[in-house]
């Protein structure tokens, strides 16, 4: 069964590659702005579902334009589509930390995480897609990808920061690493110097809880095989 990772994150691509899985990559663009007072679980569940819908729509556009026929992996069926979203969550359990929009936003996040423990949450959704015929008029049909099954998991990891000084924050921002990362830091990069300890999955903090994601893929693959056998 073919796997498509719908993510522009190089960190998620690298992690999934470590499992020696063959997969195709597509990028999706959605509005990731949290709703007012939206709780962390509600936010990341909404994000991975929205990314899956956007990816399915993109695949159908490619199929209609015959672009998909240039890629063998998009011709097999069914497909497992993986979407993921990572956020930081402050000790209040309510405040969502996404990618900082600017220096001031990053400083505000870091000041709240300094010398304390926050959580990193990652939601992963596995969506099973299958080709079906859609009637375009009374006589004609066209193939479309349809969502036939989906499952989500959420992994949480506790991360404790040392006390941060203004100079540390300034130097880190100027280095360019924080801008595209939830919570404004990368534990796999220079941000590791701020982490005194973690409790839970390290790869979850990087952006994809690898062991849990592989278990999810296996579960979805087995389910799809059973469905095909029953059919």
From Swiss-Prot:
<dbReference type="GO" id="GO:0005737">
    <property type="term" value="C:cytoplasm"/>
</dbReference>
<dbReference type="Pfam" id="PF02545">
    <property type="entry name" value="Maf"/>
</dbReference>
<dbReference type="InterPro" id="IPR003697">
    <property type="entry name" value="Maf-like"/>
</dbReference>
<feature type="site" description="Important for substrate specificity">
    <location>
        <position position="86"/>
    </location>
</feature>
<comment type="function">
    <text>Nucleoside triphosphate pyrophosphatase that hydrolyzes dTTP and UTP. May have a dual role in cell division arrest and in preventing the incorporation of modified nucleotides into cellular nucleic acids.</text>
</comment>
<feature type="site" description="Important for substrate specificity">
    <location>
        <position position="11"/>
    </location>
</feature>
<dbReference type="GO" id="GO:0036218">
    <property type="term" value="F:dTTP diphosphatase activity"/>
</dbReference>
<feature type="active site" description="Proton acceptor">
    <location>
        <position position="85"/>
    </location>
</feature>
<dbReference type="InterPro" id="IPR029001">
    <property type="entry name" value="ITPase-like_fam"/>
</dbReference>
<dbReference type="GO" id="GO:0009117">
    <property type="term" value="P:nucleotide metabolic process"/>
</dbReference>
<keyword id="KW-0546">Nucleotide metabolism</keyword>
<keyword id="KW-0378">Hydrolase</keyword>
<dbReference type="GO" id="GO:0036221">
    <property type="term" value="F:UTP diphosphatase activity"/>
</dbReference>
<keyword id="KW-0963">Cytoplasm</keyword>
<protein>
    <recommendedName>
        <fullName>dTTP/UTP pyrophosphatase</fullName>
        <ecNumber>3.6.1.9</ecNumber>
    </recommendedName>
</protein>
<feature type="site" description="Important for substrate specificity">
    <location>
        <position position="188"/>
    </location>
</feature>
<comment type="similarity">
    <text>Belongs to the Maf family. YhdE subfamily.</text>
</comment>
